[in-house]
Amino acid sequence: MIKSVLIANRGEIAIRIARTARRMGIKTYVVRTAKEPEAVYLSAADAVIDFPETDGNIPEFLDIDRLVGLAREYKIDSLHPGYGYLSENAELAERCRDN
């Protein structure tokens, strides 16, 4: 059973995922980026994780290594990509399966 989810997206989709997960009794996490430190979607989740500084080569919501690393570090048992970004990336699914 899923107990927690890292929402690897932003904006309205993150709000909708968080709302639904909360109704299901799942603890929700979102990432805060330096570009959007006060974004509305941050208040929709149970917890906010500051995204580590990047070198700018990989946009935050496309950085599979860091997203999977955050999920492991915070002992989050699932990762939801929302739509766009990593939602159609098979590598994300494989990395989640392997971790």
Annotate each language-model stretch with its function:
Residues 1-99:
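ATP-binding N-terminal substructure of ATP-dependent carboxylate-amine bond-forming enzymes
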